Amino acid sequence: ILLPFFWLPEDTLELRCHRDHVLYDVWQKQGFIQTTEGNVIHYGFIEKFIERLGETYNIREIAYDRWNATQMVQNLEDMGFTMVPFGQGFKDMSPPSKELFKLLMEGNILHGGNPVLKWMAGNVVMRQDPAGNHGTGPLHPQRNRQRQCL
C-alpha cells in the first residue's frame, strides 16, 4: 500500500496549471496535493508534516536525494528520524526499480486511485544502462541518434 503526499507552493499553483496543462488546482481541492505558503516550497511545513506522520506511523527511515537536502536532513535527524542518502543514478535506483516493476506486474501495488501518483507514473520510463542496471527517469521523446549527427 502506498500512502503518497505531494506539495506545491500556493502562490504558483495557478501558473503551474497553465504552464504544465495539469490539474494541480483540482487535485489540491480534492486533497491529493497540499500547498505551502508563498511562491517556493516551505520545507518547514513539510518537516512538521513528517513529524506528525511519525506520531501516527512507525517510520523506520527516510530516504533522500543528497542534492540540496542538508538542512532538511539535519532538521529531521534532530526530530529523531533515521535519514538514508539515496542516489538518483542507476546504482541506487536499479534494485528498487526492479522490485517496483515486479510488484506492478503482480498487481500488488495499491494506491487508492490517487490521480497525482497515476499521472506521475505515466510520465516515467524504465531505462537500462549497459551493465543491465535498471533506473527510472522522466519520459522524454526518444531522439534518433542518426538524426542528432546530421
Locate predicted features.
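Metal-dependent DNA phosphodiester-chemistry modules and their immediately adjacent helices/loops
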Residues: 23-29, 75-150
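Short, glycine-/Ser/Thr-/acidic-enriched flexible segments
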Residues: 8-12, 67-69, 144-145
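Residue-level marker for well-ordered alpha-helical positions
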Residues: 47-48, 70, 98
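Short, glycine/acidic-rich beta->alpha junctions
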Residues: 45, 64-68, 92
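Nucleic-acid-processing active sites and adjacent nucleic-acid-binding tracks
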Residues: 2-61
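Switch/connector loops and helix/strand junctions flanking conserved nucleotide-binding motifs
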Residues: 13-14, 71-73, 95
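Acidic, metal-ligating active-site segments
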Residues: 1-3, 149-150
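Short glycine-rich phosphate-binding loop at a beta-alpha junction
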Residues: 56-73
